[in-house]
């Protein structure tokens, strides 16, 4: 006990020492953070590192890798366009590199392609390779192709991004995104007495559940995959398809799927039914998800009438006396008028359909708000004018032509359509087409004042299978990638949409910046009135109060000018920070690409050492000083209550005092008179 008592400090000294130690620890934690910190799922940057003009890194610990998706550069993401960027080669071994942080992908792909002999075209994923887990749309394609090579590579030299692994080849049955690997060079941490805690290794999941969104699957069938001319079919169900021959978005495919299933334009036999789209049908429908460099508004087309028409029937009999039928149909437009408008970014996720019997509304079960996808595909075919659906939440009118009879009437009137055990597999097939008029509906819009009836709600029939699947985060079995949106990855570098600074209400409360300049005549009048007895001091007060109003107006104007200047400086600081950040990222990417030749400086020499200086702290200090001097200080009361009483209020205390003295003298005289 005696030994322990020797180590104890007095209470007051212990408090001072502990307070000093805590201050040092907090200061160390606040100011010793490196440039980039990979925590959980977001690459957060706390300071900008100075550009190092060297042909090699001082330490590999300074290098952090980030996976960036190609769709952020505006490449086409639909299946027909994406497959043209992939090709097969032989004799080149695959390469796999790891990365630590990445973006959320808008479009991912999943391929299962077979050769004509039934063998697999793509290799299975090696151990440890998991699918890219953060995809809004997964385009799952199956089919056949020649596959002239051992592996499928990217023709542009990009990577195929998986879960924290980037490979040069495509693996079978695994979700992947197209992208590149960029490298950030972080500041080397300083060695101090009290070291900050080590950076936590990036976890393979995202703790922030609010950043989740559902993953939707779209299924395709591809013929002649990997060749110059291939055919891509969007799968509605096992026997109903849509030929994709033009730019399209996932939102368009969702709406087309809902429309076909609502009107039961499905194959009711074992044969295939392939719908084609007219040349002028607008398949570029929907909004971009989060890429700010892409369009955020799209045309809205209202009042369309769609028609489903059977074109041809092909029958081929095989050795087993069974026939394989492929029926082709065309989706065309019979609208007489077209209206274009701009759609807000947050449109409701549903497709409204007008039919002659009344308004019906079909919820789009697999679409979410704010979807945006890049599009680009092959050449267009067919010949009739058409325009498909508007964007989410828009109305369209649908009518069908072709047979002129319902399916029940066709079956009852045509003996060839009557099913029998002997002829069921060889009968001529006509798709089931409901009869609707082609006249324009006169039903007022649902939200218009003239609408008197409530629109019934129709849902997709339960017995209809759909190729559009939605997987929610809690149902997913794969672990997450250290991913985030574009604003999450480089947010603190200046790329995130920051909320605007709240303007101090005290600075703009009742502040009037309008100045009143006193003229020479007003000054002479005030000076002349000042010589009048008993009235002069009041006139001087009026003149002085006018000067004070002018002074307050000057202060108010300066405060507003300081506020606007501060906002302009903040925008300028953000722009320069973004530009400097992009410069550093591009420089590091160039150094990585030229590393085999010694780096950029080895090639350019001294010209490469152009350092983009970081003046962030200097500008921030000036902004804070302006805010402290002009904006955060409270304003005096600026009530505009000028009246005849203004200017005389300062004489009230003096008048009260004089009146009190006079009353005291009178009272004293009265007392003396009474006593005498």
From Swiss-Prot:
Glycosylated sites: 40, 204, 208, 238, 257, 268, 296, 314, 366, 463, 563, 618
Sequence ranges on the Extracellular membrane side: 33-650
Annotated stretches, region: Fusion peptide: 524-539
Region of interest: Mucin-like region: 305-485
Family matches, as InterPro entries: Ebola-like_HR1-HR2 (IPR054584), GPC_FiloV (IPR014625), GPC_filovir-type_extra_dom (IPR002561)
Residues covalently joined to lipid (S-palmitoyl cysteine): 670, 672
Protein name: Envelope glycoprotein
């Amino acid at each position: 006990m005696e030994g322990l008592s020797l180590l104890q400090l007095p209470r007051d000294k212990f408090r001072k020492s502990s307070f000093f130690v805590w201050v040092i620890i907090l200061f160390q934690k606040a100011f010793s953070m490196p440039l980039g910190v990979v925590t959980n799922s977001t690459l957060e940057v706390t300071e900008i590192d100075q550009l190092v003009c060297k042909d090699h890194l001082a330490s590999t610990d300074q290098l952090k890798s980030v996976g960036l998706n190609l769709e952020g550069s505006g490449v086409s993401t639909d299946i027909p366009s994406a497959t043209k960027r992939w090709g097969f080669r032989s004799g080149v071994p695959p390469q796999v590199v790891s990365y630590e942080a990445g973006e959320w992908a808008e479009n991912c792909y999943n391929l299962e392609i077979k050769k004509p002999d039934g063998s697999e075209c793509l290799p299975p994923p090696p151990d440890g390779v998991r699918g890219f887990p953060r995809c809004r749309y997964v385009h799952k394609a199956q089919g056949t192709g020649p596959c002239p090579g051992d592996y499928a590579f990217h023709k542009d030299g990009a990577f195929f991004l998986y879960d924290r692994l980037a490979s040069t080849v495509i693996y079978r049955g695994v979700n992947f995104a197209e992208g590149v690997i960029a490298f950030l060079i972080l500041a080397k941490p300083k060695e101090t007495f009290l070291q900050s805690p080590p950076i936590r290794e990036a976890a393979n999941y995202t703790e922030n559940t609010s950043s989740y969104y559902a993953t939707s699957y779209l299924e395709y069938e591809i013929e002649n995959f990997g060749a110059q001319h291939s055919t891509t079919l969007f799968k509605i169900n096992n026997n109903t398809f849509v030929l994709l021959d033009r730019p399209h978005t996932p939102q368009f495919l969702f709406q087309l799927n809902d429309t076909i299933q609502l009107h039961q334009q499905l194959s009711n036999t074992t044969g295939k039914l392939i719908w084609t789209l007219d040349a002028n049908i607008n398949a570029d429908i929907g909004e971009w998800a989060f890429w700010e460099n892409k369009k955020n508004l799209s045309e809205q087309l209202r009042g369309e009438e769609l028609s489903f028409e059977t074109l041809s029937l092909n029958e081929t009999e095989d050795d087993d006396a069974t026939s394989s039928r492929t029926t082709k149909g065309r989706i065309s437009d019979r609208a007489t008028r077209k209206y274009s408008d701009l759609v807000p970014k947050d449109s409701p996720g549903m497709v409204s359909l007008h039919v002659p019997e009344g308004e019906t509304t079909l919820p789009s079960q697999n679409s979410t708000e704010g979807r945006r996808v890049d599009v680009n595909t092959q050449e267009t075919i067919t010949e009739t004018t058409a325009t498909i659906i508007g964007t989410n939440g828009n109305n369209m009118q649908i009518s069908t032509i072709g047979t002129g009879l319902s399916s029940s009437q066709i079956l009852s009137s045509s003996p060839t359509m009557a099913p029998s055990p002997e002829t069921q597999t060889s009968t001529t097939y006509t798709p089931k087409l409901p009869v609707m008029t082609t006249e324009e509906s006169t039903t007022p819009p649902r939200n218009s004042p003239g609408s008197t009836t409530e629109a019934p709600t129709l849902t997709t029939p339960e017995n209809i299978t759909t190729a559009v699947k939605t997987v929610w985060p809690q149902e997913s079995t794969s672990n997450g990638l250290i991913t985030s949106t574009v604003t999450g990855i480089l947010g603190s570098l200046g790329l995130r949409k920051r909320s605007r600074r709240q303007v101090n209400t005290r600075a703009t409360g009742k502040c009037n910046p309008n100045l009143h300049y006193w003229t020479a005549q007003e000054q002479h009048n005030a000076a002349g009135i000042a010589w009048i007895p008993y009235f002069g001091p009041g006139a001087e007060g009026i003149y002085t109060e006018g000067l004070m109003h002018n002074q307050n107006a000057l202060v108010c104007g300066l405060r507003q000018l300081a506020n606007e200047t501060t906002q302009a400086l903040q925008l300028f600081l953000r722009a320069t920070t973004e530009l400097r950040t992009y410069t550093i990222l591009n420089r590091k990417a160039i150094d990585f690409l030229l590393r085999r030749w010694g780096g950029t400086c080895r090639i350019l020499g001294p010209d490469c050492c152009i350092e983009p200086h970081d003046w962030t702290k200097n500008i921030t200090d000036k902004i804070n000083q302006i805010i402290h001097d002009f904006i955060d200080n409270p304003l005096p009361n600026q009530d505009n209550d000028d009246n005849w009483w203004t200017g005389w209020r300062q004489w009230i205390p003096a008048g009260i005092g004089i009146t009190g003295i006079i009353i005291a003298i009178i009272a004293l005289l009265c007392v003396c008179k009474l006593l005498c």
